[in-house]
């Protein structure tokens, strides 16, 4: 997590579109 990112416990990170 960071700015424009969503940390998922699934295994990694998913970048939020746009945000």
From Swiss-Prot:
Keywords: Membrane, Mitochondrion, Mitochondrion inner membrane, Oxidoreductase. It is found in: Mitochondrion inner membrane. Pathway: Energy metabolism; oxidative phosphorylation. The keyword Electron transport does not apply. One of its GO terms (molecular function) is oxidoreductase activity. One of its GO terms (cellular component) is mitochondrial inner membrane. The keyword Membrane applies. It is a single-pass membrane protein. Signal peptide: none annotated. One of its GO terms (biological process) is oxidative phosphorylation. Component of the cytochrome c oxidase, the last enzyme in the mitochondrial electron transport chain which drives oxidative phosphorylation. The respiratory chain contains 3 multisubunit complexes succinate dehydrogenase (complex II, CII), ubiquinol-cytochrome c oxidoreductase (cytochrome b-c1 complex, complex III, CIII) and cytochrome c oxidase (complex IV, CIV), that cooperate to transfer electrons derived from NADH and succinate to molecular oxygen, creating an electrochemical gradient over the inner membrane that drives transmembrane transport and the ATP synthase. Component of the cytochrome c oxidase (complex IV, CIV), a multisubunit enzyme composed of 14 subunits. The complex is composed of a catalytic core of 3 subunits MT-CO1, MT-CO2 and MT-CO3, encoded in the mitochondrial DNA, and 11 supernumerary subunits COX4I, COX5A, COX5B, COX6A, COX6B, COX6C, COX7A, COX7B, COX7C, COX8 and NDUFA4, which are encoded in the nuclear genome. This is Cytochrome c oxidase polypeptide 4, mitochondrial. It comes from Oncorhynchus mykiss (Rainbow trout).
């Amino acid at each position: 997590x960071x700015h424009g990112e969503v940390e998922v416990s699934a295994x990694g990170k998913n970048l939020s579109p746009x945000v």
